[in-house]
Regions:
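A short, conserved beta-strand element in the Rossmann-like catalytic core
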Residues: 9, 142-145
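Catalytic-core segments of class I nucleotidyltransferases/pyrophosphorylases
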Residues: 24, 136, 143, 149-156, ...
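A short, conserved acidic/glycine-rich loop-to-beta-strand motif
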Residues: 158-168
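Conserved beta-strand termini and adjacent loop/short-helix elements that scaffold enzyme active sites
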Residues: 90, 112-114, 165, 238-241
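Short beta-strand/turn micro-motifs composed of small residues
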Residues: 10, 53, 89, 166-167
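A structural signal for short hydrophobic beta-strand segments in well-ordered beta-sheet cores
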Residues: 177-180, 237
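Conserved N-terminal catalytic core of the sugar/cofactor nucleotidyltransferase
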Residues: 2-5, 15-16, 20-25, 30-57, ...
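A conserved hydrophobic position in a structured secondary element of the catalytic/binding core
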Residues: 10, 91, 138, 180, ...
C-alpha cells in the first residue's frame, strides 16, 4: 500500500512519550506513530448496519423457523454489537415498521423507504448524510453468522473501500462466481456453465463499506458498483465458512 508524508503538531510531552515507546520497540518515530494509529483504528468496532429489505430482498418478512427472516438477520446484527440499524425498504415498509418499531434488542432502528424502486445502489446513496464512518451492510433475505469483528480486521488490513463476504456452494453455476487473488476480488462471472466455474466462491450478501462508497453509487445496482471497484482493485474478499442460507 502506498504511503504519504504528513506533518503533525504535538505537545512536547506527548512527543517524548512517543519517542520513548519507539525506543523501547526499536522503531523510528514514523513507524511508532503508524502503529499507534493502526492500534486505535483496530480498537474501533462497527456500530452501524444497513439492511436491504426492498426490491429483491422484499421477502425479508416471510416466516422462517417461526419468525420473520428479518428477525433472524437482526438477531445476528445485535449479537455482533451493532446498535444502530438502518432498514432500506420499499412497499413493505409499513409491515416492517409495524412489526419492529423503533428498536430491536437494544439497537435503534431507522427506516428509509424507496417511494419507487430505483435499485439497491440508489437507495443506499440516499443514506449518505446519515452515515459518516465505516459501516456494515447486509441483504435482508440472507441468513448468516459472519464474524463481523474478524471481517472488519481483514477490511482494515486491506485498506480498500469495500469488503465482500464470500462463501462456497456446491452449485456455483447457479450464482455469480467470484474471481479472487489473495484477498483482492478481480471480477465476477455470472452463472458460468457447470464444470467451468473459476471457483466455488459467491457473494454471501454481507459487506463492509467506507464512506467513500457513496461517491460510487450512481449506478442502478450494487453489482455495477462492485464491477467498478474490481476494475480499480478496490474490493476485498473475506472468505467465510459458517452458516449461509438465501431464503428466496
Amino acid at each position: 500500500m502506498a504511503k504519504q508524508r504528513i506533518s503533525l503538531t504535538l505537545e512536547e510531552e506527548l512527543l517524548d512519550k512517543v519517542d520513548s515507546e519507539a525506543g523501547r520497540k526499536n522503531l523510528n518515530r514514523s513507524q511508532m506513530m503508524e502503529e499507534i494509529v493502526q492500534d486505535y483504528l483496530s480498537s474501533q468496532g462497527l456500530d452501524t448496519a444497513v439492511v436491504f429489505c426492498g426490491g429483491e430482498q422484499a421477502q425479508s418478512m416471510e416466516i422462517h423457523e417461526g419468525k420473520p427472516v428479518l428477525s433472524h438477520v437482526l438477531d445476528h446484527l445485535t449479537g455482533e454489537e451493532i446498535d444502530r440499524i438502518i432498514l432500506l425498504s420499499g412497499s413493505n415498509q409499513e409491515e416492517i415498521e409495524n412489526h419492529f418499531g423503533s428498536s430491536y434488542r437494544g439497537a435503534a432502528i431507522e427506516y428509509f423507504e424507496e417511494s419507487e424502486p430505483q435499485g439497491t445502489a440508489k437507495a443506499l446513496s440516499k443514506t449518505g448524510e446519515r452515515i459518516g464512518k465505516t459501516f456494515l451492510a447486509v441483504n435482508g433475505n440472507v441468513l448468516t453468522d459472519v464474524d463481523v469483528e474478524d471481517m472488519l480486521k481483514v477490511h482494515r488490513d486491506e485498506g480498500n473501500i469495500a469488503t465482500m463476504a464470500l462463501t462456497t456452494v456446491e452449485n456455483p453455476s447457479e450464482y455469480g462466481v467470484v474471481k479472487l487473488k489473495g484477498r483482492t476480488i478481480l471480477g465476477f462471472e455470472e452463472k458460468p456453465d457447470p464444470g467451468a466455474e473459476p471457483s466455488r466462491l459467491i457473494n454471501a450478501g454481507t459487506y463492509i463499506f467506507e464512506p467513500e462508497i457513496f461517491s460510487q453509487l450512481d449506478a442502478e445496482g450494487l453489482d455495477t458498483v462492485f464491477e467498478h471497484l474490481t476494475s480499480d482493485r478496490n474490493l476485498s474478499g473475506y472468505i467465510y465458512g459458517g452458516k449461509w442460507k438465501d431464503t428466496r
